[in-house]
Amino acid sequence: MARVERLPRPGETLTDAEFFTAPGGKGANQAVGAARLGARVRFVGAVGRDSFADEALSGLRESGCDLDVAEVDAPTGVAVIYVDGSGENTIVVAPGANGLVEPVEPEGAVLCQLEIPLPAVETAGSKASFFCLNAAPAKPVPVDLVRRADLVVVNRYELEALPETPRLTALTLGDEGAVLLEEGEEVARAEPPRVDAVDGTAAGDAFTACLVVSLLEGRPREEALTRACKAGALAASRPGAQPSLPTAEDVDAL
């Protein structure tokens, strides 16, 4: 990750960046986020046999996640992130080993993203007691996958890429908060608390993890959405991806 005062223009070189590496990835961030909120988490994924593998898994281990991770003959997935002074970012992902994640059929609730192969997502959601699809990054997905999901989490751009309207959608709106849509009709809305945004890299992952955990705890939809917005705001107010993810105590105190 490189922190810069402003994002570079095409062809421009900036020389005042602060650079560091940290574990991340949508799936890993959401797993760590859910674990910090008190959920028992099993993380399924893949890493390469390289120097990035241990760091990629370090946050998951520290958060107490159970790991079901294969070592494969491909580089560990990485993302190159630029974050400007206002917390806005641009991200380029080299999926590497993530593209070789094998399908599994986990029991219980399942949260998947689209940074792994679609067959793995489809299989994981096929027998889940609760299936949440975070349809990110935006890409074409089979209509059956959307129909199977109990909850689909998207931003405006990802919503446009869906083949049809999900049964239940959490639509994130950045600093405007989020809405829950049932069959396309708004049923709940929440605004985030005002914070000084530092880095929005994991804000969406914090939101998604908190929303899923809150719903699985049996909280009413509006309360779950409000807590999720708080989690996202807290993550945006801290630097880094996994280091920014809040605990349940953090969320409840805001």
Identify what each model region corresponds to.
Residues 1-44, 53-55, 197, 241:
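Glycine-rich phosphate/adenosyl-contacting loop at the front of the ribokinase-like
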Residues 164-254:
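Conserved phosphate-binding/catalytic region of the ribokinase-like
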Residues 42, 57-71, 79-186:
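Ribokinase/PfkB-type carbohydrate-kinase core domain
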Residues 28-32, 126, 147, 222, ...:
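A broad detector of short, well-ordered amphipathic alpha-helices
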Residues 32-40, 83, 214-218:
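Alpha-helix C-terminal capping segments
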Residues 18, 94, 191-192:
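Short clusters of small/polar residues that mark proteolytic maturation junctions
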